[in-house]
């Protein structure tokens, strides 16, 4: 299994002397030092006894499963919310009071228990949803485990053990890796079995291509991309076989560190800006409710506690428990009125509707609160590969030889995908390809192991993306006889297949790092055997002695032509193009009769890769191509849109600096001629910057290349500390910690790993950066609509509080009972509030800077407006209650048809003294099909008899809130300029809410539950007459608001943050 094992063949280092690779950098030591440190021989591997000892020290090679939160703790966490705690307290108190409901309480039987039961139901549903979301949070860690290898081929006790469970590996184990294997642990490459080894580790490091590995040690301070002699757990071998030494297992591997970082990031997840505002609102509401409830109760102390003064001292105290309980119930009703119970449900509904809108734009929301957070995004940290670019290598330039020596021809190649029909070659000689171009096409098609297939309407590569791009180029070049329709549904690579039929491949000289080229021998249809070579331009050119001209003739490669080719190569490299050169020659004389048979004498030369350089000599150079991972077509405009919207774009990539800079210039992150020396840093360079926050505050775009997971996390952490709202994109395992830490984690739906998706808040179905920008615009629109219905619901609650407070202050019977207020808050207000989520977005929504994350939901002016509206609601609901008791008519509307008795306002305000009134009598009155008579106890007229007045109050409240929802269409815009039909859903919602109110009014059973009765036509006219003025009042307030907006708001300048500091 390789050489060099004799030095340490019988050595076994004491297990306790082993150290983690953090202190022993295996990548910085040669192979013999590593074997000695881990006490192992490549030929024998570890002994069984030594494996057992190391198992005790290092444990199993698997990722830790964090202790899950107990279901009891999860339930308790759901009540760690101010609004929820207020609701819980109100429910408990209401439940207790239901048992002690006195004669003056008025609520009997089932009605008394409806309120607490409904509140408990709300809390239970809220808790279930919360627990479900919490249990989904650990899926990122579970997905991470799926990446781990399940089995490994290991040398133990001198015997090769196939299919050993990978979890049983320990540091020091000798493992054999073959093509297609998933790497089971972090390992040092100690010997190559094949001539070359390539590993796909982009999901861990962010590199766009498979990386060649070597046995040679590297600098001890190398970053993860620079550790060319290491292979990492979870990555995949795509080419070659090798022998490795396990250096780290389990949580000590790179993927284990990612696991730890995800756990750490999950512990630091913050509430969304809206949740913070609602929590603050809840805390303020708690204090206000407490004060008002206490005030209401104290105002009415005189009704249940009295005393006489004797000799200047209070004596003969009289206390009525029933009345005390009754007024305490009024205080509880006030609490119920003040709490917007329906708000959580409406917010969830609006966010859910927002997810549907975003899904139509290919943005799949995984976590509902992220919909709102998107709207205040100030910085987008984007990965390059696959997000800004297509992650599909494409040829962008083709350089061929000219008609005479010392001349070159250059062709620009369009297209950004593996679709052969995507773009064309500019100025291409269709149907009349010269001999030089034919040779380039032949080499690109045959010296190639990749394939392109059509899957689900998309073209995907099988094999190396670079080679797939070459085959796509061949299809765009067409065929000499004029066959240019390269692709069809059943035959994607027609031209490549035709070349393969004409030139039968008989041998392959595999790529290796030393000669940096690949060659194939072909048996041509012309009867000649040729060697076709592709590889690094400098290396292929160095082994070339001739060049092929346009007409197919060859000339000796002189220094001028060599310099011309190298200069063109240099110019293309400045554009971050990866260049591949093409050459050919007649096969060496030893292979003149070779047909691929293993019995041929020349076949032995092919078994030794050291012979390949001599075989690939005396070549004829024919041309070269420049390839790249091209930027997506929509990205440049999307980045310009971000700039207009006040959102900064930072590119954070694991790719090399020059490639990333070229892409950033092309897509508009940087200007073409801009000095970016202070804006483009590697991850390591950024970590060495003294004032990192100041660096991140630079206006315009920033680039961080060769970035490791820790660099991404640090950038996100610093931005969040500086008050930015950060959206982070990523697709790899290495991105997961930063995705979890960011305010908005955005994963790629097509190329993204399951780990990245599970750690994210948003998944892009099309992997397209421009989709993020569209989602941000949608998020802003949703937030504006949420702000509209939150303000609407809060203003409604202010009105209810004002109504109850006025009732208590005036001393009249309570106009509305808690169950009625609960119905209004949960059901009646729900449809209009939800419909406000359908308000059309502002046309200039992406031309405004992002709102501040601490932007107030309710400004002082808005609060004043709703206090005015709330006061009117209180006056209207209490006023209609008083009108029914004290007037036969109002505004010409006859109210005497039901035959109820009139009382004076003084009697109504002192109804508690009714029993002391001499000769007080009331007439029976009708409500619907019921007749109410109070002959036995006339004082019941102010309790059971208030049912009609209470119905009027409730109906006025419902009607005002419906009309007030029209006011909420726009913060300052008049209904004249923004009429109700701009949102037809709102008109439908108003009809639904009125319909629901009619149901509880006119269905006898429900009317009994809610303590109301049907209203006559005249009574409905009274309701409308009292309710409609709310529109006029708010129109006046909006007009004042428009006139004074310049005084109340000032624009936020770009330097605002610096001034604040």
From Swiss-Prot:
Active site: 383
Membrane topology: Multi-pass membrane protein
Record PROSITE patterns: ATPASE_E1_E2
UniProt-annotated stretches for the region Disordered: 1-21
Predominant subcellular localization, coarse grouping: membrane
Domain of life per record: Eukaryota
Keyword rRNA processing attributed: no
TM region positions: 71-91, 116-135, 279-298, 328-345, 787-806, 817-837, 858-880, 951-970, 984-1002, 1018-1038
Residues binding Mg(2+), per UniProt: 731, 735
InterPro entries according to UniProt: ATPase_P-typ_cation-transptr_C, ATPase_P-typ_cation-transptr_N, ATPase_P-typ_cyto_dom_N, ATPase_P-typ_P_site, ATPase_P-typ_TM_dom_sf, ATPase_P-typ_transduc_dom_A_sf, HAD-like_sf, HAD_sf
Pfam families: Cation_ATPase, Cation_ATPase_C, Cation_ATPase_N, E1-E2_ATPase, Hydrolase
EC number(s) given by UniProt: 7.2.2.10
GO CC annotations on file: endoplasmic reticulum; extracellular region; membrane
Topology, Lumenal side: 92-115, 299-327, 807-816, 881-950, 1003-1017
One annotated GO molecular function: P-type calcium transporter activity
UniProt-annotated binding residues for Ca(2+) 1: 797, 800, 828-829, 961
Gene3D superfamilies per record: Calcium-transporting ATPase, cytoplasmic domain N, Calcium-transporting ATPase, cytoplasmic transduction domain A, Calcium-transporting ATPase, transmembrane domain, HAD superfamily/HAD-like
PANTHER family to which the protein is assigned, alphabetical: CALCIUM-TRANSPORTING ATPASE (PTHR42861)
Stated family: Belongs to the cation transport ATPase (P-type) (TC 3.A.3) family. Type IIA subfamily.
Function: This magnesium-dependent enzyme catalyzes the hydrolysis of ATP coupled with the translocation of calcium from the cytosol to an endomembrane compartment.
Stated name of the protein: Calcium-transporting ATPase 4, endoplasmic reticulum-type
Organism: Arabidopsis thaliana (Mouse-ear cress)
């Amino acid at each position: 299994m390789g050489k060099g094992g004799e030095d340490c063949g019988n050595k076994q280092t004491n297990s306790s002397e082993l150290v983690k690779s953090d202190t022993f950098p295996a990548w910085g030591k040669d192979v013999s030092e590593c074997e000695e440190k881990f006490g192992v021989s490549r030929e024998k591997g570890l002994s069984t006894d030594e494996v057992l000892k190391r198992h005790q020290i290092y444990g199993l090679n698997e990722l830790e499963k964090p202790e899950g939160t107990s279901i009891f703790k999860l339930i308790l966490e759901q009540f760690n919310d101010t609004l929820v705690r207020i609701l819980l307290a109100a429910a408990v108190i209401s439940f207790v009071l239901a048992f002690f409901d006195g004669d003056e309480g008025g609520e009997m039987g089932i009605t008394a228990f409806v309120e607490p039961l409904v509140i408990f139901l709300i809390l239970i549903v809220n808790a279930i949803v919360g627990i479900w979301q919490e249990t989904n949070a650990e899926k990122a860690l579970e997905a991470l485990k799926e990446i781990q290898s399940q089995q490994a081929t290991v040398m133990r006790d001198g015997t090769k053990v196939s299919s050993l469970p990978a979890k049983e590996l320990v540091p020091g184990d000798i493992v054999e890796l073959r093509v297609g294997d998933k790497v089971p642990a972090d390992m040092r490459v100690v010997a190559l079995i094949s001539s070359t080894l390539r590993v796909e580790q982009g999901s861990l490091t962010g590199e766009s291509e498979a990386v060649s590995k070597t046995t040679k040690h590297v600098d001890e301070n190398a970053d993860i991309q620079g550790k060319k002699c290491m292979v990492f757990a979870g990555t995949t071998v795509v080419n070659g076989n090798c022998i490795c030494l396990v250096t780290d297992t389990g949580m000590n591997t790179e993927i284990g560190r990612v696991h730890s970082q995800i756990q750490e990031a999950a512990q630091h997840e913050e509430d969304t800006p809206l949740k913070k505002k609602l929590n603050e609102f809840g805390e303020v509401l708690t204090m206000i409710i407490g004060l008002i409830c206490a005030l209401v109760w104290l105002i009415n102390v005189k009704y249940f506690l009295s005393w006489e003064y004797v000799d200047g001292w209070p004596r003969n105290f009289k206390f009525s428990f029933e009345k005390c309980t009754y007024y305490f119930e009024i205080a509880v009703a006030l609490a119920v009125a003040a709490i917007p119970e329906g708000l959580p449900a409406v917010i969830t509904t609006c966010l859910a509707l927002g997810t549907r809108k975003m899904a139509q734009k290919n943005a799949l929301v995984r976590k509902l609160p992220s919909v709102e957070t998107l709207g205040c995004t100030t910085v987008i940290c984007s990965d390059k590969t696959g997000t800004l670019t297509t992650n599909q290598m494409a040829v962008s330039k083709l350089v061929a030889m000219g008609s005479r020596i010392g001349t070159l021809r250059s062709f620009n190649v369009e297209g950004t995908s593996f679709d052969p029909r995507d773009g064309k070659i500019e100025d291409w000689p269709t149907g009349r390809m010269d001999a030089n171009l034919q040779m380039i096409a032949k080499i690109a098609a045959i010296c190639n192991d990749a394939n392109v297939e059509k899957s689900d309407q998309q073209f995907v590569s099988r094999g190396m993306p670079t080679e797939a791009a070459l085959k796509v180029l061949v299809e765009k070049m067409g065929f000499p006889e004029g066959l240019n329709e390269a692709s069809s549904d059943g035959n994607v690579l027609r031209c490549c297949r035709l070349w393969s039929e004409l030139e039968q491949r008989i041998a392959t000289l595999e790529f290796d790092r030393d000669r940096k080229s690949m060659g194939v021998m072909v048996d041509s249809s012309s009867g000649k055997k040729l060697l076709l070579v592709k590889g690094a331009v400098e290396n292929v050119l160095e082994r070339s002695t001739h060049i092929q001209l346009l007409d197919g003739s060859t000339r000796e490669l002189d220094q001028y032509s060599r310099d011309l080719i190298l200069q063109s190569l240099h110019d293309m490299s400045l554009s971050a193009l990866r260049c591949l050169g093409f050459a050919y020659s007649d096969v060496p004389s030893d292979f003149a009769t070779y047909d691929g048979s293993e019995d041929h004498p020349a076949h032995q030369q092919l078994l030794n890769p050291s012979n390949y350089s001599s075989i690939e000599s005396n070549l004829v150079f024919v041309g070269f191509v420049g390839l790249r991972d091209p930027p997506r077509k929509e990205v440049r405009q999307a980045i310009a849109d971000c700039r207009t919207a006040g959102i900064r774009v930072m590119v954070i990539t694991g790719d090399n600096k020059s490639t990333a800079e070229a892409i950033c210039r092309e897509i508009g992150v940087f200007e073409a001629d801009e000095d970016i020396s202070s804006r483009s840093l590697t991850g390591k360079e950024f970590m060495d910057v003294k004032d990192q926050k100041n660096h991140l505050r630079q206006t315009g775009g920033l680039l961080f290349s060769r970035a490791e997971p820790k660099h991404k996390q640090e950038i996100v952490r610093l931005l969040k500390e500086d008050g930015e709202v950060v959206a982070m994109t990523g697709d790899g395992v290495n991105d997961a910690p930063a995705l979890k830490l960011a305010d908005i984690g955005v994963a790629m739906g097509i190329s993204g790993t399951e780990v990245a998706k599970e750690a994210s808040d948003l998944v892009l179905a099309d992997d397209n950066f421009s989709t993020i920008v569209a989602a941000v615009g949608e998020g802003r629109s949703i937030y504006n609509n949420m702000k509209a219905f939150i303000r609407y619901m809060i203003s409604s609650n202010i009105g209810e509080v004002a109504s109850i407070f006025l009732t208590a202050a005036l001393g009249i019977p309570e106009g509305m009972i808690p169950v009625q207020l609960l119905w209004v808050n949960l059901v009646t207000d729900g449809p209009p509030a939800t419909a406000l989520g359908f308000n059309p977005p502002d046309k200039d929504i992406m031309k405004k800077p992002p709102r501040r994350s601490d932007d107030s939901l309710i400004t002082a002016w808005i609060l004043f407006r709703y206090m005015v509206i709330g006061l009117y609601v209180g006056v209207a609901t209490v006023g209609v209650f008083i009108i029914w008791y004290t007037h036969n008519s109002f505004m010409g509307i006859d109210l005497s048809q039901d035959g109820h008795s009139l009382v004076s306002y003084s009697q109504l305000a002192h109804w508690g003294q009714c029993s002391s009134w001499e000769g007080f009598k009331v007439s029976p009155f009708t409500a619907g099909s019921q007749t109410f008579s109070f002959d036995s106890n006339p004082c019941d007229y102010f309790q059971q008899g208030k049912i009609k007045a209470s119905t009027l109050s409730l109906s006025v409240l419902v009607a005002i809130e419906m009309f007030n929802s029209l006011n909420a269409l726009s913060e300052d815009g008049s209904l004249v300029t923004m009429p109700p039909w701009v949102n037809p859903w709102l008109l439908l919602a108003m009809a639904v809410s009125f319909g629901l109110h009619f149901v509880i009014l006119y269905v006898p059973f429900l009317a009994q539950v809610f303590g109301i009765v049907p209203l006559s036509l005249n009574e409905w006219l009274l309701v409308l007459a009292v309710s409609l003025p709310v529109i006029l009042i708010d129109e006046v307030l909006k007009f004042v608001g428009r006139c004074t907006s310049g005084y109340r708001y000032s624009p936020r300048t770009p330097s605002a943050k610096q001034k604040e500091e």
